[in-house]
Amino acid sequence: MTASPESMGQKFRNMTANECFQSRSTVLQGQPFGGIPTVLLLNIILWVCVVLVYSFLRKAAWDYGRLALLIHNDSLTSLIYGEQSEKSSPSEVYLEAERRDKGFSTWFFNSLTMRDRDLINKCGEDARIYIMFQYHLIIFVLILCIPSLGIILPVNYIGSALDWSSHFGRTTIVNVSTESQFLWLHSIFAFMYFLTNFAFMGHHCLGFVPKKNLHFTRTLMITYVPTEIQDPETISKHFHEAYPGCVVTRVHFCYDVRNLIDLDDQRRHAMRGRLYYTAKAKKTGKVMIKVHPCSHLCFCKCWTCFKEVDAEQYYSELEEQLTDEFNAELNRVQLKRLDLIFVTFQDARTVKRIHNDYKYINCGRHPMQSSVTTIVKNNHWRVARAPHPKDIIWKHLSIRRFSWWARFIAINTSLFFLFFFLTTPAIIINTIDMYNVTRPIEKLQSPVVTQFFPSVLLWAFTVIMPLLVYFSAFLEAHWTRSNQNLIIMYKCYIFLVFMVVILPSMGLTSLDVFLRWLFDIYYLEHATIRFQCVFLPDNGAFFINYVITSALFGTGMELMRLGSLCTYCTRLFLSRSEPERVHIRKNLAMDFQFGREYAWMLNVFSVVMAYSITCPIIVPFGLLYLCMKHITDRYNMYYSYAPTKLNAQIHMAAVYQAIFAPLLGLFWMLFFSILRVGSLHSITLFSLSSIIISVIIAFSGVFLGKFRIAQQYEQPEEETETVFDVEPSSTTSTPTSLLYVATVLQEPELNLTPASSPARHTYGTMNSQPEEGEEESGLRGFARELDPAQFQEGLELEGQSH
């Protein structure tokens, strides 16, 4: 005699209560209404406290909350001469923002009332795409609140499977009888959620598909070029003979500039110090400073290492030493040529032809030959369209081939074993439970501790662990910032979804259970129990608490950025002079990491979509998170991070991940149908069909999106001349920051900085003292030449002719 679905469901509920949640777990232990009211109240209180503390720190802590504004206002000109009465655009915009940012809490209201146009003018086109993506998610989740709270939640609550004492459980799908026809509503709405989300993402894509002329380049990046070739004419000759009618306008060789870039940064740092104290000495006389990093810790002047020295002389001598080292390294760079070149052509059609000729070289196809084929060895070349010069990380170009792949594989293998086998948050917390660490907490029997503490701990792990992924991407030494952000985004998202959604949902909450689930053959026979963990009432409450914590306490901590604040305060405390403090402020204003922020946001979005049907009360809290995240990101992009510009791959990857997020909800419904109503039930078959159709639609959308973007790179009908494609004779008018040459090699005129100082009394001139107006003019010109492009790492799209 077979058991009924109802009795089978009751049996599984009894089994999984002990199997999914450890007997003394402080994380997944049931509480009245899941502890949600307590967690919500505590998060509101903490969020208010964090905002108040940050309002004080943002200006009290040496302009910590306004670093993005300081990278424009703290130029050498303002450092030496003070703020000027007349500022050219866009500096006027930043000064206006500073004038509006005078009160204790004006920054908060400015973030709410800030116009999108002001944000886009300062932060660039990528900021517009990012906030538009958030707008689409917010509107989508807002629409989801209507069926989730108006239809699914009442249907769940009027069910009869659970007792009336189970307050939170009655709001979940567990309370719906397996014989009820209302289960059709859950399956239908899960499929409708996917279709609606797909439509919203498609509409969002229409707003940032790259225009033809903006993304087309006439420059090719060629690797595996023999390093013995030193004459650009050899490369030009090959292309001219192999492709008749081809005109090469420029050939750029690449060099190993890792050491040169580091020396240049130190040299410019010393240069700022010398210029600052030279100007200050003219006004107030000789300035004495302590140069030891720990001099602020000791107020005694008797220690030799803490003695004061002449600031102007110190920085002049330091600049002279670093300049000599820089010039010596600059002379050696020519001997460190890489097997990588950038070739710019006059005709866009030629670029397409050459690129297609080398596209299938790995399949045995031979490219066109020339009389110098044996010299250039073009059969070994790998040809690709060149990224924008501002997108290239020049110091990483020297790390390639075996060393790059060995580093990449070693780093990611370590991360995989660390994250997926040992350190998911639920595994760590329950492993701690095994050693009685949390027994004092259990004795308190307070939902404040037993519910709020675990949700904060889960949030902390989901922040700290992706930071390891984030920093590991820098160790991988990617060639472009776009690829670096893309890798960060994919790794963080995949890791977070497994760590936060999939493993805890299936009850894999302790290391021994996880290893048994992976490797024990007999344990796998009872794998059905694992999937039942998805549908326990307390499991949904656990994820609601996580979303609440991320929405309030989490966004508050994103404002605070404790790690950056500690680093900032420490570096300022150990600084030796005002120029160093300006340098610290500028360097700490990092680019806004779109990849990391996308991953964190989409992780919470995936949690909401996974439980939007089985636990519909999570949807309004997901809306709260998206709204708070949007406000926080607007503030951070404008005030705390430097502008950045990437290619469309980052934003398209976010769209793909958002499209696949509702599939989790469909899979959850399929598991529920199989386990509760049977694998051959009509609801189960409908859920399976919905998943198949949704997967086909999702992959079709991805392929169509990639195809559409690929079409934009095809040759445009009407070509527009870009700054890269001008004739060599016009290079004098070409901005040096837009050449395919490392920035450190573009300014040879700055290798030596003629300025009188006590350390160097003469630079070979007859005049002992320059005219005051002449020196002031020179310093102003140098300041303008040195600063404008240094702190804007953004990728500017070429050929912007509107």
Curated annotation (Swiss-Prot):
InterPro entries: Csc1-like (IPR045122), CSC1/OSCA1-like_7TM (IPR003864), CSC1/OSCA1-like_cyt (IPR027815), Csc1/OSCA1-like_N (IPR032880). GO terms for biological process: glomerular filtration; monoatomic cation transport. Residues 753-785 are annotated as: Disordered. Acts as an osmosensitive cation channel preferentially activated upon hypotonic stress. In contrast to TMEM63B, does not show phospholipid scramblase activity. Enriched in mitochondria-ER contact sites where it may regulate the metabolite flux and organelles' morphologies in response to osmotic changes. In particular may regulate mitochondrial motility and function in motor neuron axons. Required for the functional integrity of the kidney glomerular filtration barrier. Residues 61-124, 206-401, 477-480, 574-593, 641-647, 703-802 are cytoplasmic. The gene is Tmem63c. Belongs to the CSC1 (TC 1.A.17) family. Signal peptide: none annotated. It catalyses: Ca(2+)(in) = Ca(2+)(out). One of its GO terms (cellular component) is plasma membrane. Expressed in podocytes of kidney glomeruli. Keywords: Calcium, Cell membrane, Endoplasmic reticulum, Ion channel, Ion transport, Membrane, Phosphoprotein, Transmembrane, Transmembrane helix, Transport. It is found in: Endoplasmic reticulum membrane; Cell membrane. Residues 1-35, 158-180, 432-446, 518-540, 613-615, 677-681 are extracellular. It is a multi-pass membrane protein. The chain crosses the membrane at residues 36-60, 125-157, 181-205, 402-431, 447-476, 481-517, 541-573, 594-612, 616-640, 648-676, 682-702. The modification Phosphoserine is found at S75, S78. Its main location: endoplasmic reticulum. This is Osmosensitive cation channel TMEM63C. Monomer. One of its GO terms (molecular function) is osmolarity-sensing monoatomic cation channel activity. It comes from the Eukaryota.
